[in-house]
């Protein structure tokens, strides 16, 4: 789980100082392009190498700036203000899971070392409504009770963290879903803004495992038995 300080939400990072742009458009659609940006910072306390996307060529420049600020504060700010005095080393990259004219869904993965301790694997997501220029929460697109009913082994594929050889019965999967709702990948993320991703027809869930239980993640993705239409609002 990543703990977020208030200062990160206020954007106290000079974006222009440490960012290099890779002038290679990826995932282009008719209304915008996605550019790969890199944030690199090396100081006595911090080593950060973070790749993240930015949007270009939107007709609404003000909205484009708002979206890019959201992306930057999530991609970089979560690490920067949390660990600024703790001898942080972090390396993170991203995958564009889905993008079209209306939405973009990004999954971030990387490793963080604090004060020369063992590296921790980090995983979180960011989903943005490109029409509104806002972050999408789980309940904006998914009916939680429908998802609860469909949250069964046959409907999900294990991407990471859960041994498929361990038999979880129906009640076990129910407990795992309750765990997903209770524990958050990002501290205080009651709306589950940062622990899911989606495509046209699939959803991925990132379940945070508490530090005292190993501090890792379980990542599940819906199988062909479960479509987004089955769990949409």
Where are these regions (language model features)?
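Compositionally biased intrinsically disordered regions enriched in Thr/Gly
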Residues: 4-233
């Amino acid at each position: 789980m990543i703990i977020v300080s208030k200062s990160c939400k206020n954007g106290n990072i000079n974006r222009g100082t440490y960012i290099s742009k890779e002038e290679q458009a990826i995932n282009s659609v008719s209304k915008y392009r996605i550019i790969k940006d890199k944030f690199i910072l090396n100081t006595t306390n911090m080593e950060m190498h973070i790749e993240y996307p930015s949007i270009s060529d939107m007709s609404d420049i003000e909205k484009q700036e708002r979206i890019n600020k959201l992306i930057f504060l999530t991609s970089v700010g979560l690490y920067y203000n949390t660990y600024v005095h703790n001898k942080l080393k972090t390396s993170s990259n991203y995958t564009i899971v889905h993008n079209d004219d209306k939405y973009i869904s990004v999954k971030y993965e990387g490793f963080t070392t604090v004060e020369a301790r063992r590296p921790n694997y980090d995983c979180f997501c960011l989903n943005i409504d490109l029409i509104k220029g806002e972050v999408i929460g789980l309940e904006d697109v998914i009916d939680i009770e429908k998802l609860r009913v469909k949250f069964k082994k046959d409907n999900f594929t294990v991407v990471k963290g859960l041994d498929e050889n361990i038999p979880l019965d129906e009640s076990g999967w129910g407990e795992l879903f309750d765990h997903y709702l209770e524990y958050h990948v990002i501290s205080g993320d009651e709306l589950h803004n940062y622990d899911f991703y989606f495509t046209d027809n699939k959803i991925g869930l990132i379940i945070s495992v508490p530090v005292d239980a190993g501090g890792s993640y379980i990542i599940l993705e819906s199988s062909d038995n479960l479509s987004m239409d089955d769990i949409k609002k």
